[in-house]
From Swiss-Prot:
Annotated organism of origin: Prochlorococcus marinus (strain NATL2A)
InterPro entries recorded: Lgt
Membrane topology: Multi-pass membrane protein
Keyword Cell inner membrane: yes
GO molecular function: phosphatidylglycerol-prolipoprotein diacylglyceryl transferase activity
Family that this chain belongs to: Belongs to the Lgt family.
Protein name in the entry: Phosphatidylglycerol--prolipoprotein diacylglyceryl transferase
Lineage: Bacteria, Bacillati, Cyanobacteriota, Cyanophyceae, Synechococcales
Subcellular locations according to the entry: Cell inner membrane
Length: 303
């Protein structure tokens, strides 16, 4: 029996249009993620005894660096789609077509969370060095917001009809319009809603992180600096590794989508690296009984 009534279907990428201006769901979701992250991180920072202005000062730098990093990362691995005849695009402003490099069309989709994590982390390192803050104390109050923001932001993929999985007939299947399907799946209507899987997984990760933070804040649990960040790397990456294997649009190293034949899925490689890094961090903290080195310190010493 086919459970059509449970099939997901995107209403489209635009929430509304007013003259030459349009508001896209993806942009709205990112804005919501930022606002939720600001409030949550500020609350956690206050409970941890950090300066009240810290998150407000950091957030604009972090968001800008993360968005730029997410786009650069994506374009770097999909550069063939942004060269030659595809190099130029245009935007319509007041009935004028203004040419711009297509690589700048971030509102049309095409960002990668791992690029955001890389550039975002670098921005936090430089910020902590500038403000003379302990890197691990700062990032530990941010990772719950990152997980929650990812859970919210993933729904942008739903509205854009992107980042979906292989064909399926499960009750929670996702309908993808013909023009968005890979050619080899052109006659198939329903696919795995990988955006939903990752959104639910990130809520689970957020729940673990916020539970542990609150336990530590009540002195019921000892969480040395960096513990939450390492746990985030492990838990998020475990889910991402599995979900990435279902996607039809992976960034590939030496192969081509939808299955990266003859190559490797980059997100899975990065996930394995992050899991390993997180496990090494946990081992250093709890087995070797050593503090994690502070990357924002000029000589990398522990603080």
């Amino acid at each position: 029996m086919e459970h059509i009534f449970l099939a997901l279907r995107s209403p489209g990428p635009e929430l509304f249009q007013l003259g030459p201006f349009s508001l896209r769901w993806y942009g709205l979701l990112i804005a919501i993620s930022v606002l939720v992250g600001l409030n949550l991180s500020s609350e956690l920072a206050s409970k941890k005894g950090l300066k009240k202005s810290l998150i407000n000062d950091l957030l604009p730098i972090l968001v800008l660096a993360s968005v730029i990093g997410a786009r650069i990362y994506y374009v770097a691995f999909e550069w063939r789609n942004y060269t030659g005849k595809n190099f130029w695009s245009s935007i319509n402003f007041l009935n004028l077509n203004i040419p711009i490099p297509s690589a700048l069309e971030i509102w049309g989709g095409g960002i990668a969370i791992h690029g955001a994590l890389i550039m975002g982390t670098l921005s936090i390192i430089f910020f902590c060095r500038w403000r003379q803050e302990h890197f691990w104390d700062v990032i530990d109050v941010l990772v719950p917001s990152v997980a929650l923001g990812q859970a919210i932001g993933r729904w942008g993929n739903f509205f854009n009809n992107e980042a979906f999985g292989i064909p399926t007939n499960l009750p929670w299947k996702l309908f993808i319009p013909y023009r968005f399907r890979p050619e080899i799946f052109s006659t198939i209507d329903y696919f795995h809603p990988t955006f939903l899987y990752e959104s639910v997984w990130n809520i689970f990760v957020f729940g673990i992180l916020i539970f542990l933070f609150r336990k530590a804040n009540k002195k019921d649990l000892k969480l040395p600096p960096g513990s939450l960040s390492c746990l985030y790397l492990i838990t998020y990456s475990l889910g991402r590794f599995w979900i990435e294997g279902l996607r039809t649009d992976p960034l590939c190293l030496g192969g081509v989508p939808p299955f990266c034949e003859g190559g490797l899925r980059i997100a899975q490689l990065i996930s394995l690296f992050l899991i390993s890094a997180g496990l090494l961090g946990i081992w250093r903290i709890y087995v070797s009984k050593k503090a994690l080195p502070d990357p924002s310190s000029m000589n990398g010493r522990n603080q």
